[in-house]
């Protein structure tokens, strides 16, 4: 046995005691050890077990006698001795329990059942909830306890402080569930001690038992305790030995406080579970709490020191840590540091005050506080200012750090300037500053030094933006504009692949103006469309289908005729985007022209095959080989020259070789494998749109996939409609339109924009919601474009208007179709507007109405109509209001007249007009002055006109010709080849050989300068 070694902590587990308890016993027996992990001999272990067993036996005997003979005065005296424990709430709870135990035997079992749950609360805060749940069964006991509590103070007059203490602990437990957050720290306890007036025996018992069970565990911290708190506890009683026992229980309290630390909960729970086992055993005897007290009594004095100090130590350690942190923070922020020091001083004073109060009120206050969860909201605590001080400190630290985050947030704002920016159009000063990461003030200052006064909302053009960017060393990139002919939407979905069928090809006829596109189409259709076009030029897209035979089978080809005039670029691009094959018409006598090149670029952008029709080969001046050469320069090499481009010479007027052209078109269509799914909802493109005075909004749609039917809910761009009727290219009503066919539909709510794509939806509600959403987006885009297109701000506009520098021509534009409106607006933008700006107040398809006239009268605008009519009453209203209405059917004349109107707004300029030359051949002195005898070499001399006297290369005089005489008679003018006398009142220094140049200043109408 002597060789066997036992570790102290193993022994403590075996005895269900704390390591400190075992170490105390080792001190009493003079057993050497270093720590709780030291080993001792088996003999020493047996000695320790014996002493521990004696301590348990004595405590149990005392408690059992105290409970059974509570009525005898002798036993009461023993309880008075124990009453010193009453400083500790656990003991008062015990006495309270003894009385109810006598009152009714039936209450005892109920007493035993509640004590077990209370043990768990000691381990961790969640345990209390369980205890609180089990407390209700002891309601009867609570009623019986209340009188017993009153008896206790009367029976124990020897202990003046004990009596109030006994009352306080029960009240404290009763309040525990509510103030549970408050009691996380030991400070709030003094308040609760004064407050208790209710007697919650069951909860008090739980508190006492928990404390007694945890009594051994606090020994760990007791060794660190300072003697200050024990002395405070001794002062109230004056009996140091008796106070030892309460101190023991205080240790318990300290142990309970451990759960406050996040790192220790696991260990504490383990020890508390062991302690619960011991309490359960003692509870069966009915001497549960007395047993613990006996153990505590053995180590009384030491334990008094231990319990009191641990809370102090915990506070002090945290306070010291906070002080160190404050000192560090003070280095960075002096002001914040001063505030923290003040709060620290308050904290220290409150700490001392709280420790004194805890000593006067008795250690049980610490017990209750330590048993409760940590970090309570101490807002309710009136006497102790400590919690408040701590709270003040904590926020102060963050505030010290808050400065840094602000600076960090400000730093990223200073973003690096980009090396290059992408500019697609005009930008406001604010938008440019965001793009360049440069303050607006810098941009405004830069422009101001360059002589341009701008404000933050003013729009800058691309040239100005490039100039500003150069000053800030930023490159400006202008992205290449995407061709409008590029096909952006794939009309065939994956779901259509299983149901695809062949469809007719859509062929677009393109070429330069007057090269015979519409005549060629007329010859193919055997109609006379070209004769109906104003001026013989096509002014909007026409869609027609032609039935032809190919390989003995009937085939169909859908033709789109596009305008060739330069103003209709958008229409040509739109035609190329929806087409399958492009037929390029080139006049054999004219060659490749600008619109021919443009048509080639559109077809290439749309990635469609090109078939060239060389027209007018019947003319004597036709030279097809020259055309092929010019097309080769554009990258189109004829097949007979070794290329891949099909070129067919035709005569549209005579209808020569048209069958060959159609054959080539169908061959190309076969190679392209054009397919669509007719068994689905239709989708396609708006070819043209207009507002008809009788039909309302009308749109020409090209169905590219699916089948369009009457009654379908359609969304074209941002316009909703339900198809009421469909009309084909020959004026016949149809019920359905299959892929590749163009139809005119009625039933739209508004005029859609040409080029918009349309979709058919099953649900009218869904279609309406999509249309509304798109309308909002389009409105916002339009407003943004209107703002960005402002060339001047309102401030500069008013200044220029006052000074007469700004001229504006207000226009209201009405046309037959949407495409014509686009073309006219595009052409107007090409006019120079440096001195006169064009403001289009309204541009829409439809007839000219009285509303348009009223708008023109209010704004001083000119109403321009193109291929449209006047509504009833519009002409009379215009005459009454004095509004000028101009109607055109050829775009050339429209543009010429608008340019003339713009020039008419310009102030006429004074121009020098040459009159003639004369040579001085003699000088005559007349009175004080001199007169020059001259010979008119060219032109004429006119009196009261301007003249210059040139002597060699110098101009000697410049003034007015005052006197002109011929043969001593005044003459108004002298023509070439005649002699005359010239007199000038302010010039007499004539010399022979001088040249007189006569001129006059005339007012001349200005032209627009680009």
Swiss-Prot record:
Residue numbers binding GTP: 511-518, 561-565, 615-618
Task: Note the PANTHER family from the entry.
Answer: TR-TYPE G DOMAIN-CONTAINING PROTEIN, TRANSLATION INITIATION FACTOR IF-2-RELATED
Annotated region G4: where? 615-618
**G5 as annotated region, ranges:** 651-653
Q: Where is this region: G3?
A: 561-564
Compositionally skewed regions (Low complexity) per UniProt = 378-389
What segments bear the compositional bias annotation Pro residues? 112-124
G1: where is this region?
511-518
Residue ranges with Polar residues bias = 57-70, 145-155
What species was this sequence derived from? Microcystis aeruginosa (strain NIES-843 / IAM M-2473)
Q: Do you know which SUPFAM superfamilies this protein is assigned to?
A: Initiation factor IF2/eIF5b, domain 3, P-loop containing nucleoside triphosphate hydrolases, Translation proteins
Q: What is this protein called?
A: Translation initiation factor IF-2
Positions of the tr-type G domain: 502-675
| Segments of this protein annotated with the region G2 | 536-540
The UniProt function text for this chain reads: One of the essential components for the initiation of protein synthesis. Protects formylmethionyl-tRNA from spontaneous hydrolysis and promotes its binding to the 30S ribosomal subunits. Also involved in the hydrolysis of GTP during the formation of the 70S ribosomal complex.
Taxonomic lineage of the native organism: Bacteria, Bacillati, Cyanobacteriota, Cyanophyceae, Oscillatoriophycideae
